[in-house]
Amino acid sequence: MHNYKLTIQYDGARFKGWQRLGNNDNTIQGKIESVISEMVGKEIEIIGCSRTDAGVHALNQVANFQSDEKLVEHKVKKYLNQYLPNDISITNVEEVHDRFHARYNSKAKTYLYKIWNEEHTNPFMRKYSMHVNKKLNVKSMKAAAKHLVGSHDFTAFSNAKSKKKSMVREVYTLDVMEEAGFVQIRVSGNGFLHNMVRKIVGALIEVGLGQLDAEAIPNILEEKQRNQINCLAEASGLYLENVEF
């Protein structure tokens, strides 16, 4: 059995997310599986490292699949890019150890979130950022972000779909940056609960708008109540930026 690792970029705007929900429906996983299965002449299942939601984008998603026959990597890449829609791109294909698992072997993930922070809309970025038309207090957002770095129970920053045995995750870095009309948030950690990144961004937006005190974050973490963060940041601004193994 041969195991192949795919590195993938996609514009998630028109898709229902990464995870296949039915028989090769409009998902990233479904589209890629359909083309690979056609290529090898049998049904193939791929495993992604991150099950991104509808509307979320990826600069470096990683997946793997297994094949009975040995495949030529550059030919696989060429075939996939020829037949996949042009909002999905395979940037690399390589054969890896048979025990490599894209989801379970990942050690760290980095997400980038883009906020368009001008009074006027940006029509070119409406599918690729969240528009906040009131000026954000980035200094306060940075102060709040410091409280979220480290190992914590992130129940308050998840949604009801998160049914993990442990809600503890470690955030390695959480940076807030201003750049040419944008406020960008980059977060790295050992793993993230469902909607955790979007809830973190939502909390930072609330802080930036003066709706939440930065010093309230430790209490929110401690109390573990999901209803304390009212803002779930839009999917459109979220990018899976990098995965480390």
Curated annotation (Swiss-Prot):
Q: Which GO terms describe its biological process?
A: tRNA pseudouridine synthesis
The UniProt entry's coiled-coil ranges are: none
Which Pfam families does this one have?
PseudoU_synth_1
GO terms (molecular function) for this protein are:
pseudouridine synthase activity; RNA binding; tRNA pseudouridine(38-40) synthase activity
Instruction: Give the enzyme's EC designation.
Output: 5.4.99.12
Q: What Gene3D superfamilies does the record tag this protein with?
A: Pseudouridine synthase I, catalytic domain, C-terminal subdomain, Pseudouridine synthase I, catalytic domain, N-terminal subdomain
Q: Which SUPFAM superfamilies match?
A: Pseudouridine synthase
The record's top EC class is: isomerase
Tell me the keywords, alphabetical order: Isomerase, tRNA processing
Q: The organism sits in which domain of life?
A: Bacteria
Q: Where is the active site?
A: D53 (nucleophile)
Q: Where are the transmembrane segments?
A: none
Q: Which reaction does it catalyse?
A: uridine(38/39/40) in tRNA = pseudouridine(38/39/40) in tRNA
Q: What does this protein do?
A: Formation of pseudouridine at positions 38, 39 and 40 in the anticodon stem and loop of transfer RNAs.
What's the family? Belongs to the tRNA pseudouridine synthase TruA family.
Q: How does it assemble?
A: Homodimer.
What is the name of this protein?
tRNA pseudouridine synthase A 2
Q: Which organism is it from?
A: Bacillus cereus (strain ATCC 14579 / DSM 31 / CCUG 7414 / JCM 2152 / NBRC 15305 / NCIMB 9373 / NCTC 2599 / NRRL B-3711)
